[in-house]
Amino acid sequence: MKDQWLDRWDNRYSAEAFAYGELPNNYLKEQLEKLEAGTILFPAEGEGRNAVFAATLGWQASAYDISSEGRNKALKLAEKNNVTINYQVGELDTLGYSPQSFDAVALIYAHFPAAIKSAIHKGLDKYLRNGGIVIFEAFSKKHLEYIARDENVGGPKDIDSLFSIDEVKSDFANYDFLELEEKEIDLNEGIYHNGKGSVIRFVARKR
């Protein structure tokens, strides 16, 4: 399963075109522009569009993914934008981040395998300082209805890899939600996110 998961993303990111475009996610952009720049971590960052954008705002951006192909694309994008990002390849518990070393964590379409997604969310908590911010956007469980109508919108087809409001409240139980909603949005992100979809979005502060 792990090898299949890695192969899937390496194959997607090895193409010349950026799978989800070179521009940042709209929700992330909107939220980061409200915050004072600091240190930020991007799990499952893929080709780096969001970390690179954060770096252009003055954030010290760290990122990780299991895909070395994703990292290669991300570093090229950073160079194109005249910024640097700290991008590692591996899984969270192997990367050596220091506890409470980040001011923010951005989870943007970070759809981990269903069996481990909650554990990863809870594992990320120790790296975020008290009072730090999580910015989250990912597909909701209702999104399967949108995929059935138009596969171009992308996203996991396994309902257990998708999210509900109750699920994120449970995973982030020691956070105060500054905003939290399930919403239909129009996606226009590169090759694989196009059309109407259903997402969970939130901004939350660690207690």
Model feature map: region roles:
Residues S118-N130:
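A short glycine-rich, Lys/Arg-flanked "PGG" loop and its adjoining helix->strand segment in the class I
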Residues D93-A104:
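A short acidic, Gly/Pro-enriched loop at the edge of an enzyme's catalytic core
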Residues S67-E69:
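Conserved SAM/SAH-binding beta-strand->alpha-helix loop
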Residues M1-L35:
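Conserved class I S-adenosyl-L-methionine
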Residues D103-S118:
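A short SAM/SAH-binding and catalytic strip from SAM-dependent methyltransferases
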Residues I159-E182:
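Short alpha-helix
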Residues N81-D93:
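Conserved SAM-binding strand-loop segment of SAM-dependent methyltransferases
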Residues G131-F139:
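Conserved beta-strand signature within the Rossmann-like core of class I S-adenosyl-L-methionine
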